[in-house]
Amino acid sequence: MAEGGTGPDGRAGPGPAGPNLKEWLREQFCDHPLEHCDDTRLHDAAYVGDLQTLRNLLQEESYRSRINEKSVWCCGWLPCTPLRIAATAGHGNCVDFLIRKGAEVDLVDVKGQTALYVAVVNGHLESTEILLEAGADPNGSRHHRSTPVYHASRVGRDDILKALIRYGADVDVNHHLTPDTRPPFSRRLTSLVVCPLYISAAYHNLQCFRLLLQAGANPDFNCNGPVNTQEFYRGSPGCVMDAVLRHGCEAAFVSLLVEFGANLNLVKWESLGPEARGRRKMDPEALQVFKEARSIPRTLLSLCRVAVRRALGKYRLHLVPSLPLPDPIKKFLLYE
């Protein structure tokens, strides 16, 4: 069996059959030469949640200088920082201690994942809140295709989603799009799947769906934004309302979209036929709610609320409680 050669960067590639992949990953992605990465006690302690060992090690300057070092550890394959490891395991006390000792909260691993993102993915609310309070970017990193908001919306963790929103997460954000309309090497979107509002509906997570809308999520996302829906795959939903109906979501999803000002004319009547109903049977009550809403003009009260919220913009909705208005009107504007 031939030995592995060298890669384009001059580093040795994987060796013969059955190569030690962990060692190869360490060689490729660790922050320091291999001879300096043999001592993984700091990373191992973060993995098992051994706070006392972390305290002891970080009393020494040699370990304090390595607090942001990416390295493999006892049970890990991809080189990560101690904070990233502790966040993955959900050791909130270790996460807090490492941050207070100088760990950088927004460093990314080789996949572009931040400590906050992996805390959310693994469902650790305490670690999520500690990282957010320490200033972690609630939107994650542009180097990764997903976001904390998107994942929380997909799995129905409304408690984590509330925390992300409270710390200013963008409820429409997705890292597939850039400010440029046609950025070089960008991938054009051909579906709604990158939209947090859409994914919460696709998985029938009503509470997350409501939270996103209350926080200012665009009910017509991808229809009046930077995406050309004409390039969507034939038969795929062109707007969130269309997707809600096709996925067989209950009537409450439709009612919320109507209440938050969705453009009902974006759904084509011909798209509601049996051949366009998708994998699930369309909810007859939801379809009836949609048809009734489309046939009856919205009330002036409803239109005013939508107009005021749009004028404020999603980034200023949190200021509504400070407006010089009666409490009932504030609650009305916030859909409380």
UniProtKB/Swiss-Prot annotation:
Database matches in InterPro entries: Ankyrin_rpt, Ankyrin_rpt-contain_sf, ASB1_SOCS, SOCS_box, SOCS_box-like_dom_sf
Keyword Repeat tagged: yes
Loss of function: phenotype: Decreased spermatogenesis with less complete filling of seminiferous tubules but fertility does not appear to be affected. Deletion mutant mice exhibit less severe colitis associated with less decreased body weight and longer colon length compared with control littermates after being orally fed with dextran sodium sulfate.
Disulphide bond pairs: none
GO cellular component terms, A-Z: ubiquitin ligase complex
Molecular-function GO term, any one: ubiquitin protein ligase activity
Pathway(s) this gene product operates in, as recorded in its UniProt entry: Protein modification; protein ubiquitination
Keyword line: ANK repeat, Developmental protein, Repeat, Ubl conjugation pathway
One Pfam family this sequence matches: SOCS_box
Tissues where this protein is expressed: Highest expression in testis, spleen, bone marrow and salivary gland.
SMART domains the UniProt entry points to: ANK, SOCS_box
Keyword Repeat: yes
Domain SOCS box: 287-336
Gene Ontology terms describing biological process: intracellular signal transduction; male genitalia development; protein ubiquitination
Each ANK repeat, start to end: 37-69, 78-107, 111-140, 144-173, 192-221, 236-266
Source organism superkingdom: Eukaryota
Role summary: Probable substrate-recognition component of a SCF-like ECS (Elongin-Cullin-SOCS-box protein) E3 ligase complex which mediates the ubiquitination and subsequent proteasomal degradation of target proteins. Mediates Notch-induced ubiquitination and degradation of TCF3/E2A and JAK2. May play a role in testis development.
Family membership noted in the UniProt record: Belongs to the ankyrin SOCS box (ASB) family.
Free-text domain note: The SOCS box domain mediates the interaction with the Elongin BC complex, an adapter module in different E3 ubiquitin-protein ligase complexes.
Subunit structure, as described in the record: Interacts with CUL5 and RNF7.
Protein known as: Ankyrin repeat and SOCS box protein 1
Source lineage: Eukaryota, Metazoa, Chordata, Craniata, Vertebrata
